[in-house]
């Protein structure tokens, strides 16, 4: 062999020897010696404790799926046991994540193209604890060591990372959130066989079009949310789908908290950045008010409800997020509801906007909004209030609602919502239709401008203003009732079908207090009512359940059916006490004047009724009548002393020029002389 050949052989032999020695060293190297260095470096980079406390090892294996010369290149198969990741210094708990064992395979040839490629990684029984102490203090936000020293002009790294699959047998996530008062455990299990998105949602065409990933893991949740027990089940996509910006991440869940249920299925867009969601969303429960604790959206207390709609959300935690609940359908009590609502987060307050419609609205289902028993479902609504610490405070013997308006919550959001009710049900007969209102809530200032609805062939329009930012709340109501037909007000009463009369009215009230009773109890304002061409009888009073009216009509007119030409009332209200300027009835037999007071604060009546015969017919009553007692239990009787002199009632009414003129304004010009009240009030003005 020549000298050159010997040198070449020696170099080749030495090179092969080095390779063999390197392979032997790598194969027999105790990788546990690197644990202190790895633990220290990772802990410093993450700014929180990290440790591999168990065995760290590498096994080199050839990959059978590779072909050609690549099949001879061994791949490192790494395993590490008993891994812990701690919390930041300001989180009292020690451990955030614990992994009994992690395995992964690295593709070595990919390093030549500056790619770190892990074909798979397997996690054994991962256990994580997510903690949030305040809005800005949690353990899942990482403050990396070089975050503060990043060069804004630095070029991105030439290296890339690729992960093809994440496997694990069973995982557990514990959530301790002081903000939402959540203390939950979520158990994650592989489904065994991935479920196509379309099989769960029933939207095959849509799923294929959007290339939604399959459901891979099942979820079970238990614990407490906002102090209430919560349980639930669900499904989510694979972990790799989390990083796919173009692939929506599938989610499905069904949660229950008490009697409140929230169920949804759909997708999360750009899940690593939580860019938004597109879900079919269902709610149900004892009261819409219960959803405040779950969603942060302020809604009124109602009878039992359920809704089903589509939620499309665009989420931006830095600026504001938009949650669009589109085309929902459902019910509240026995009333159907439909519409779309948009909830926008942001400063100074989030805002709720949209349109809601009910084709058949049961008026009693609106009862809890104003503190009135809603009938069917009322018990569940009351239990919902008691669960929140809101006990019924209606005193015995009182009629006016005492339930308090929750003004302390009115400043949590603003609202601009329009509501329409096409057909209204109230009891068996009261004819109400076409209810509409524009609800505006801004900085705890609530307005219903306007509130309109049809009633008995006429209309009622109102502007309601409640200043919830004032202590106590200030309230104002301006109400107009026009051309309510008497026979339609009582369609089931045969007697009233004989009349063509109408009722008109105006009310202006101002008050303060946090309930209807309190507002009226110190209210100031005026109430005007005018009725023409009516009928009255003892039988009518009995039908409508007015025992006091039955007594009074019988005392004045006996058992006769009496035509009422005009009934007029102009009441001044001061400090919750109503005093009539005019309160009179002109009938075919008598002219009746009512004086006295009615107190909204004490709900006490103290009225005197003076009748005066008209024409030849003489009424038999020899003394005035009184009505005393409470709104709930009024008592009527005959006052001591004779009736006032004949003609005195008419003379007294004739002096009330200004109140009479105010009542004339209630008569529409189109009615002309057909309205008998016009003639009577015009005579009073002269």
Curated annotation (Swiss-Prot):
The lineage of its organism: Bacteria, Pseudomonadati, Pseudomonadota, Gammaproteobacteria, Enterobacterales. Residues 28-686 are periplasmic. Keywords: Cell inner membrane, Cell membrane, Membrane, Transmembrane, Transmembrane helix. Residues 376-391 have a biased composition (Basic and acidic residues). Disruption phenotype: The mutant does not exhibit growth defects and does not show outer membrane permeability defects. One of its GO terms (cellular component) is plasma membrane. Residues 1-6 are cytoplasmic. The keyword Transmembrane applies. The keyword Cell cycle does not apply. This is AsmA family protein YhjG. It is a single-pass membrane protein. Belongs to the AsmA family. Residues 372-396 are annotated as: Disordered. GO terms for biological process: regulation of protein targeting to membrane. The chain crosses the membrane at residues 7-27. It is found in: Cell inner membrane.
């Amino acid at each position: 062999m020549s000298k050159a050949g010997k040198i070449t052989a020696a170099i080749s032999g030495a090179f092969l020897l080095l390779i063999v020695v390197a392979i032997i060293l790598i194969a027999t190297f105790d990788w546990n010696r690197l644990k202190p260095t790895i633990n220290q470096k990772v802990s410093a980079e993450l700014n929180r404790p990290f440790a591999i406390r168990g065995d760290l090892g590498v096994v080199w294996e050839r990959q059978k799926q590779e072909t050609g010369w690549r099949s001879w290149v061994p791949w490192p198969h790494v395993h590490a046991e008993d891994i812990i990741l701690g919390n930041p210094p300001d989180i009292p708990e020690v451990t955030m994540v614990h992994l009994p064992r992690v395995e992964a395979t690295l593709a070595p040839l990919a390093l030549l193209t500056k790619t770190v490629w892990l074909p798979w990684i397997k996690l054994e029984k991962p256990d994580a604890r997510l903690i949030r102490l305040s809005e800005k203090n949690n353990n899942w936000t990482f403050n990396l060591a070089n975050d503060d020293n990043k060069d804004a002009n630095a070029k991105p790294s030439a290296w890339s990372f690729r992960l093809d699959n994440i496997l694990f047998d069973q995982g557990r996530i514990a959530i301790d959130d002081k903000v939402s008062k959540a203390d939950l455990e979520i158990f994650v299990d592989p489904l065994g066989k991935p479920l196509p998105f379309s099989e769960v949602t029933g939207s095959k065409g849509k799923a294929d079009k959007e290339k939604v990933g399959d459901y891979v893991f099942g979820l079970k949740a238990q614990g407490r949310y906002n102090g209430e027990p919560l349980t639930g089940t669900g499904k989510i996509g694979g972990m790799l789908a989390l990083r796919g910006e173009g692939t929506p991440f599938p989610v499905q869940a069904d949660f229950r908290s008490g009697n409140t249920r929230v169920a949804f299925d759909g997708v999360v867009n750009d899940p690593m950045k939580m860019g938004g969601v597109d879900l079919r969303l269902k709610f149900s429960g004892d009261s819409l008010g219960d959803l405040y604790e779950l969603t942060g959206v302020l809604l009124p207390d109602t009878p039992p409800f359920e809704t089903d709609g589509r939620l499309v959300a665009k989420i931006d935690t830095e600026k504001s997020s938009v949650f669009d609940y589109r085309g929902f359908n459902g019910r509240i009590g026995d009333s159907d509801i439909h519409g779309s609502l948009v909830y926008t987060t942001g400063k100074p307050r989030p805002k709720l906007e949209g349109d809601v419609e009910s084709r058949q609205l049961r008026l009693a289902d609106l009862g809890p909004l104003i503190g009135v028993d809603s009938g069917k479902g009322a018990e569940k609504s009351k239990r919902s209030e008691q669960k929140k610490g809101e006990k019924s405070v209606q005193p015995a013997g009182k009629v006016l609602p005492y339930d308090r308006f929750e003004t302390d919550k009115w400043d949590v959001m603003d609202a601009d919502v329009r509501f329409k009710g096409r057909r209204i049900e109230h009891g068996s007969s009261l004819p109400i239709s076409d209810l509409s209102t524009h609800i505006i809530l801004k900085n705890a200032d609530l307005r219903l401008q306007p509130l309109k609805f049809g009633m008995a062939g006429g209309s009622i329009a109102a502007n309601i203003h409640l200043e919830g930012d004032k202590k106590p709340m200030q309230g104002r109501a301006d109400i107009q009732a026009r051309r309510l037909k008497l026979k339609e007000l009582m369609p089931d009463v045969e007697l009233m079908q004989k009349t063509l009369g109408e009722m008109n009215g105006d009310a202006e009230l101002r008050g303060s207090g946090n309930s209807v009773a309190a507002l009226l109890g110190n209210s100031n304002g005026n109430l005007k009512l005018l009725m023409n061409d009516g009928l009255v009888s003892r039988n009518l009073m009995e039908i409508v359940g007015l025992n006091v009216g039955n007594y009074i009509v019988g005392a004045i007119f006996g058992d006769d059916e009496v035509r009422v030409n005009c009934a007029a009332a102009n009441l001044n209200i001061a400090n919750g006490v109503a005093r009539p300027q005019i309160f009179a009835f002109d009938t075919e037999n008598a002219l009746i004047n009512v004086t006295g007071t009615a107190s909204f604060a004490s709900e006490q009546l103290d009225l005197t009724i003076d009748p005066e015969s008209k024409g030849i017919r003489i009424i038999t009553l020899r003394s005035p009548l009184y009505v005393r007692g409470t709104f709930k239990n009024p008592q009527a009787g005959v006052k001591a002393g004779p009736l006032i002199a004949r003609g005195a009632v008419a003379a007294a009414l004739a002096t009330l020029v200004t109140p009479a003129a105010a009542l004339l304004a209630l008569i529409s010009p189109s009615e002309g002389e057909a309205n008998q009240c016009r003639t009577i009030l015009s005579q009073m003005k002269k």
